[in-house]
Amino acid sequence: MVKVSNLGYPRLGEQREWKQAIEAFWAGNLEQKDLEKQLKQLRINHLKKQKEAGIDLIPVGDFSCYDHVLDLSFQFNIIPKRFDEYERNLDLYFAIARGDKDNVASSMKKWFNTNYHYIVPEWEVETKPHLQNNYLLDLYLEAREVVGDKAKPVITGPITYVSLSSGIVDFEATVQRLLPLYKQVFQDLIDAGATYIQIDEPIFVTDEGELLVDIAKSVYDFFAREVPQAHFIFQTYFESAVCLDKLSKLPVTGFGLDFIHGRAENLAAVKQGLFREKELFAGIVNGRNIWAVNLEETLALLEEIGPFVKRLTLQPSSSLLHVPVTTKYETHLDPVLKNGLSFADEKLKELELLASAFDGNKTKGYHEALSRFSALQAADFRHVALESLAEVKLERSPYKLRQALQAEKLQLPILPTTTIGSFPQSPEIRKKRLAWKRGNLSDSDYKDFIKTEIRRWIAIQEDLDLDVLVHGEFERVDMVEFFGQKLAGFTTTKLGWVQSYGSRAVKPPIIYGDVKHIQPLSLEETVYAQSLTKKPVKGMLTGPITITNWSFERDDISRSDLFNQIALAIKDEIQLLEQSGIAIIQVDEAALREGLPLRQQKQQAYLDDAVAAFKIATSSVKDETQIHTHMCYSKFDEIIDSIRALDADVISIETSRSHGDIIESFETAVYPLGIGLGVYDIHSPRIPTKEEIIVNIQRSLKCLSKEQFWVNPDCGLKTRREAETIAALEVLVSATKEVRQQLDN
């Protein structure tokens, strides 16, 4: 019989119990022993769920207090020297992730092309890896008590781990330093009764992986020789694996391949017979989107694969970390739509149905699921309608002309100061919003409260002497979900939460049908804010690429059509803002880089579509209207031409945790438009010093002119506390004024 495996399960819990426990601990409202007790109960609940769902190989080690890459760094003592004064305990673990009053946090980067963030391992001259504790063994022993021999340890492989690290001088030598530690972890697991061990090596779906195949042979030869009893699974996901003709010869028991995002290439490799002597762990249920699987199409795929492999195991295409837990609470949705959704728990059920069908037993549940899938495909809200783009202006006047008109209109100083958009959402804001959602607060009272917050923060910004203000986004839970609630073709969930970084969870909207602008999105709040001040207030919108990348997108039309549908909707809102006297409009594309395909050969088509959509949204404005955009966590040297092609008057970039890397991009490539490189890290509660911000500004001015440079935090301030936000912005403004004086002299 075919088996079913899982790669990873969401940490958050059905009601975000994980987030609540960790944040209570950070706030000093929960003792460590109580935190550990609550997290253990969550882990056990997740294990039991998967066992009851019929999963034969249940992941262990996917659960974390913050991030699984940080777990590995902590286990192997890859600890930045600046944290030497800490004992090796949970306080240190969280300090690395979040920073403290004296030390900046480690860098945070996107996990491949997802919206999940990992903590970058830092290697220094003083780094001395050793097995500080075998936490994976502890988790495995705990899991065996619950699920027995179904427990399958999961660990990020050494080649991927080092690839994701900073400070690497000699790549292969660094990998070799880790091998004895991995060996000890594996041997301890085998001695404790483990059989299958999943080693995640997603670096081998990237172009970089092609350069690492020889190292992989050396590494996995070592593991096979030193821990011969282990049944290793070489796991990839998010794309087709590279160099499978060589990787398939590695001395491992099985290979995990993604047949959702790399179907054609991976299937071709299978049909070449590369896995006839291997177990294949086939990722055939989408681990990154929330639509029910097409059972018949997937069953046909399995029948294609089956004859070419030694043994077949079914699994999701990736960890289920990237989807919500369960659809059972989404009773408010249209029944046809709800029945067409599949979150983590439903995906496990789909795998069970497919395994049974592949073994020749199409159960009643199989036919019911097939019927629900067919009903969604036939629904009348799913068309492929796209307004004609023939009348849409795609090019603006030359930047120099626009710059002069905008300078005359806005009258800003050199090095203008601003923020990215959002301000802290206090407990009072959350309380009022919840009361409003539950019907305990009238629409008018809620709007009055939001206006009070806008008025208060406009005054705060004026007191700080910021140059360009924002309304603060107090009406928004999330920069994408908010728009999903107001545009046609979107819906939102009650508990469809997904982990983004640390304890931060997002609730992506679902794009289920054609997207259209049917009502103002942020007009009222923005115009009200502008009425309170003579300084310019930015209109704050989210761009079409970010809305798509941070939503669960429909899978029945092309991405370019979806980009363009959303772009036309955003264009309508921009025109409303401009007509209402808003002179600066920011269209955030925080996730543009995130959506970049992992293979270079596929990237330009995506970037071309992204640039076209941004221009559809923004190019119809007057020359004197200043268009801003914002981007997060990006390797900009790779996409600098496309960023330039967006033709935004000003771009702000989240850079503070990797300021030097970003600066290098602009030292080697001329960027002629306005730009703000984030001068301090908003993801840490630490208040930056004036000297730090001055250094960041001065370094930026070595490759950017004072006429084009803006000073801003590196991201929105929604997750920070009010006091630390004001304190940090005071430092930012003071530092900027000092640099202005230096430039005047």
Swiss-Prot record:
It catalyses: 5-methyltetrahydropteroyltri-L-glutamate + L-homocysteine = tetrahydropteroyltri-L-glutamate + L-methionine. It holds the Pfam family Meth_synt_2. It is an enzyme of class 2 (transferase). GO terms for biological process: methionine biosynthetic process; methylation. Its EC number is 2.1.1.14. Pathway: Amino-acid biosynthesis; L-methionine biosynthesis via de novo pathway; L-methionine from L-homocysteine (MetE route): step 1/1. Keywords: Amino-acid biosynthesis, Metal-binding, Methionine biosynthesis, Methyltransferase, Repeat, Transferase, Zinc. Zn(2+) binds at H630, C632, E654, C715. The keyword Aminoacyl-tRNA synthetase does not apply. One of its GO terms (molecular function) is 5-methyltetrahydropteroyltriglutamate-homocysteine S-methyltransferase activity. CDD domains: CIMS_C_terminal_like (cd03311), CIMS_N_terminal_like (cd03312). Transmembrane segments: none annotated. Its cofactor is Zn(2+). Belongs to the vitamin-B12 independent methionine synthase family. This is 5-methyltetrahydropteroyltriglutamate--homocysteine methyltransferase.
